[in-house]
Design a protein with these regions (language model features):
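A structural signal for short, well-ordered beta-strand segments and their strand-loop junctions
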Residues: 33, 54-55, 140, 147
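Short, amphipathic alpha-helical interaction segments positioned at domain boundaries
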Residues: 80-85, 152-170
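Membrane-interface helix-loop-helix junctions at boundaries between adjacent transmembrane segments
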Residues: 58, 85-87, 114
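Short alpha-helical segments that sit at the start of domains
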Residues: 69-99
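Loop-centered beta-sheet repeat module
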Residues: 95-157
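Charged, structured surface patches that assemble and position nucleic-acid processing machinery
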Residues: 50-62
Length: 170
């Protein structure tokens, strides 16, 4: 007998999958995640924790009951729908200032008010950025503020977008 426990989500973030992994009961069979799109980082978290996944782009990874499936590298068929916040773009000056401040001391626990005053922006802008950082498991919300928990991954993701060149044609 072979049981598969599937979790279907409209949107998935690394923080979401980490919570699912914590809650799952391994004795109840193999767990899989199904979502419209699963990022490379989320996929890696799934694989590292033995959780299968399938997305609408055709990316998948599944190991269970003598079955092995793996397909990677397919692009997101609807990228604009999945990425509503462009925090890393060069045009996101405020986000860039906040991120630079966070990287000044990644061991520190940051308060929204302090960050907003330090970079001269609204608390709402800082809060919006922190929400995205928490969803992606780069920052953790603590009782007394926010702490960067995965600076390497955050910096890598930021550098991917920040390094893109704009192409202008006339």
């Amino acid at each position: 007998e072979f049981h598969i426990n599937a979790c279907f989500l409209n949107r998935v973030f690394p923080s979401t999958i980490m919570k699912l992994i914590e809650k799952r009961d391994k004795s109840q069979g193999v767990s899989i995640l199904v979502a419209p799109y699963i990022s490379e980082r989320t996929a890696q978290i799934c694989e590292d924790n033995g959780m299968g996944y399938f997305d609408y782009a055709g990316n998948c990874w599944f190991v269970g009951h003598s079955i092995y499936l793996s397909e990677k590298g397919n692009k997101n068929p609807r990228p604009k729908e999945q990425r509503s916040v462009f925090i890393f773009e060069k045009t996101s000056v405020v986000s860039s200032c906040i991120l630079r401040e966070l990287f000044a001391d990644v061991t520190k626990i940051w308060k929204l008010k302090y960050l907003s005053e330090k970079v001269n922006c609204s608390i709402g802008q800082v809060s919006k950025l922190m929400k995205v950082l928490v969803e992606n498991a780069w920052v953790e919300k603590m009782p007394d503020g926010y702490k960067v928990i995965d600076p390497e991954s955050l910096l890598l993701e930021w550098s991917k977008d920040y390094g893109k060149k704009e192409i202008t044609s006339y």
